[in-house]
C-alpha cells in the first residue's frame, strides 16, 4: 500500500498522474483517499493536478468507438443547486439535430439525481444502454457511457465520494475522460472563478474545441439567471468571454425556476419538455444546446444554434429519438 502525503502539496502533472494512479488502483486506504480528496478540495486543485489526474483515469478506461465529430455535453456536478437534468436533455436535443452525442455520466454522487438516475427513470435499462452503446451511437447518434462501465477503477472511489457528499477532483476528472475520446465538448463547472484553471487543464490535454462554462450563481451549466463565464478552448489555447441568455433572445429566469427533485421528478420534467412544455427548463436546454452545437462546429452563430435546438424540440425529433433509444437498448 502507498502512503498519501498528509500536507497534500501542489503536484506537477506527472506527480498527480502517479498519485492518482495509486488511488485508482486501490493502493491507498479509503480513509487516506477521503482525507486526501478533501484536502485538495479545500486548497483548490491546480490545472496541472487536474490534467495529471485525468491522464491517470484515461489510462485505465475501457474505450468505445465513436463517429467523427461526436460530442459530449456534461457538468461536473456538485453545484448544490439540485436543478433539473439540463445536459441530459441537451444531449437528446443535439443528437436529434444531427450531431452524434457520446454522453458520459454517472449516478448522483452529491446531488439528488445524476444523468444515469434520470435516464433509468425514463425507461432506459442501464445495463442494456452500456452493452449497446457503440450500436446506438452509430445507428441513431446517441449513447450513454455509464462511468462505472468504462472506468472500473472508479468503483472503488464512488462509495468514498458518496460518503463525503461534496465535490472533489473526481467531479473535474470525469468530463476530461470521455471513453469515446470526443474532441469537442460543452463542460459546465460549478465555480465561475475556476473556469480559467479548468480551461488550462483542458488545454494541456488538448481538444479541437471545448466550451467550459459556469453560471455566476455557481451553476455547472449556462444559466438564465445572469452572466456566465465561458472559456473557448481550441487546441492547447483558450480565450475567455462573457455570455448571456438574452443575447439569443431567451428571457431571464432565476435558478429556482429549474429546481429539480429525485430521478422520477426529473424524468417527468424531461419527458414533458420533449413533448412541448414551454418555460425556463426548455430555455435553459436551448441555451446549452446552442453552445454545444457551437462547440461541435455544427453552427457558427449562437442564434442559429438556438433555432436548431428549438426545431429539434418542436418537430418532435428529440422525443422520437428517446423512444428509439429505449427500443434499441435491450
Swiss-Prot record:
Q: Which cofactor does it need?
A: Mg(2+)
Which molecular function terms from Gene Ontology are attached? anthranilate phosphoribosyltransferase activity; magnesium ion binding
Gene3D superfamilies recorded: Nucleoside phosphorylase/phosphoribosyltransferase catalytic domain, Transferase, Pyrimidine Nucleoside Phosphorylase, Chain C
Q: Provide the binding site for 5-phospho-alpha-D-ribose 1-diphosphate.
A: 75, 78-79, 83, 85-88, 103-111, 115
Tell me the function of this protein.
Answer: Catalyzes the transfer of the phosphoribosyl group of 5-phosphorylribose-1-pyrophosphate (PRPP) to anthranilate to yield N-(5'-phosphoribosyl)-anthranilate (PRA).
- NCBIfam families xref list: trpD
Q: Know the name of this protein? A: Anthranilate phosphoribosyltransferase
